[in-house]
Amino acid sequence: MRRLFLLLFMLFTTLAHAGNNPFEVKPDFLPVGKAFVFTSERLPSGETQLFWQIADGYYLYQKRLKFDGVAPELQPTLPAGEDHSDEFFGQQTVYRQGLEVKLPAAASGKVKLGWQGCADAGLCYPPQTLEVDLGGAPAVAASNVATTSNGSAQDQLLANDLQHKSWGLGLLAFFGFGLLLAFAPCSLPMLPILAGMVVGSGASPRRGLALASSYVLCMALVYAGMGVIAALLGSNLQAWLQQPWVLGSFAALFVLLSLPMFGFFELQMPALLRDRLEGASRQRQGGSLIGCGILGALSALLVGPCMTAPLAGGLLYIAQTGNALFGGLALFALGLGIGLPLLLLVTLGNRFLPKPGPWMNLLKGVFGILFLGTAIYMLRPVLNPGLWMGLWGALALVVAYCAWQQRAIAGRLLHLFGAGALLFAAWGGMLLVGAAGGGDDLWRPLKVYRGGPVANSVTAHDAFTTVKSPAELQGALDSARAQGQWVLLDYYADWCVSCKIMEKTVFGQPQVLEALKDVRLLRLDVTLDNADGRELLSRYKVPGPPSMLWIGPDGSERRSQRITGEVDANAFLQRWTQTREAR
């Protein structure tokens, strides 16, 4: 019980972000090729050594390293990095100074490497790719590659990103998650169906175990296939899931699936399908391995849509990793977790299975709260920050109410439930009060009442016109020049941490928007990897976002006043004043 409520608490606190840490203006950053100098060498042992020389003040993300073209069993083991905390992307593992990776001698052919790095001063370079020949030939071509991240609605919900070195922990987490899903309303009807096919047929214990294993393995293999597909889709799946209508649809689905957890209605497998499966199980005397396997595969396909919400969380996380091997193993582990109670049922009988009771209602409540939290989390990119914080406050009050109501079954944990209820009630109340005052900081909800301007990132977002192609940019520049208007070009990407920080700390400040009221604000979105995005970057030789360029009324850039990297509101306003006076 203690762990369950600790999990709920962590669900909220992982969304909180730290205070701002603005940097001085640093107009000159190294080109990406000098910040991260890559070399490859064929060793006498037959291995291929890959090395990145990383300049001081720069770092590479571990999770952005890709080795496309290397067989799953030959993927390299990445060395331990150092922890790095991003305000929006959470805890990350990064490499500084240098990174050495060795590909085994058995690897052959051309490999497409991918990586992404940033500067401590705030600049985030676009994702890079490089093709190398494992025979030792030099790298031949480099280009940007599409990579999107947690920010979006992202949609990662199961846990903090698990690094490559923590596969064991990740697989264990998916197995445990599957064990919980085994007692979801959609899964429970499969218990008597399989029992009727195995136990009711009079099969021996050994035969019953074989039949049940066939059922569970085939079910897990179907889930594994889902995981592999999600990993192969990778960034394409994430990019598709960033669309507002998709985020809204999934959020609505999570809310809908939370309602039966609180007893509003009952969600279960359609009676027609359940009856047909039961009939098929009765017709098979003694059962067969193939029959049980087919039944297991069908159950995964039939029950899967009924469990769309939790499955979506797992699939989204797997899509982030982009690793098909891990995706398949993770969903296979989840399927085994779902099937474990079935194996216990047919081998040990129902004596060792959990008995229905108040704990089931508690488990359903936990699922309901997690589903609601998932819905709120997914809507982050499309909601007013104040409204988003208010929704978290309302959910915290729901948690407090549920914890207070469950004190009757808490037993010796009565005081823990009571303290947890009071804690969530206090936090939820502060979130609502802060949201009502225009605040948007989950970690410090009442700071809005301390005085000083309050960021309004929605107003900032509305003030910008999003540009995604060179044609759109040229049209906007021509229009501004015809009107004798200044233009601010803001290079932005969803995977850019500093962009999201500046959205709030710079462009969300009233004094900044007031100073820019006569300036045409263009946001150049270079999130995706396509020809348009690369041309937008190359037109002004921009290394990556965040970068801000001033275009004068004559249509030419004020190059000496360019801002590259993260700055605070005061530094930004000072640069704008200098630009305006220097014309």
UniProtKB/Swiss-Prot annotation:
GO terms for cellular component: plasma membrane. It is found in: Cell inner membrane. The chain crosses the membrane at residues 168-188, 214-234, 245-265, 289-309, 326-346, 359-379, 382-402, 413-433. Keywords: Cell inner membrane, Cell membrane, Cytochrome c-type biogenesis, Disulfide bond, Electron transport, Membrane, NAD, Oxidoreductase, Redox-active center, Signal, Transmembrane, Transmembrane helix, Transport. It catalyses: [protein]-dithiol + NAD(+) = [protein]-disulfide + NADH + H(+); [protein]-dithiol + NADP(+) = [protein]-disulfide + NADPH + H(+). GO terms for molecular function: electron transfer activity; protein-disulfide reductase [NAD(P)H] activity. Its EC number is 1.8.1.8. HAMAP family: DbsD (MF_00399). Required to facilitate the formation of correct disulfide bonds in some periplasmic proteins and for the assembly of the periplasmic c-type cytochromes. Acts by transferring electrons from cytoplasmic thioredoxin to the periplasm. This transfer involves a cascade of disulfide bond formation and reduction steps. NCBIfam families: PRK00293.1. This is Thiol:disulfide interchange protein DsbD. The lineage of its organism: Bacteria, Pseudomonadati, Pseudomonadota, Gammaproteobacteria, Pseudomonadales. The gene is dsbD.
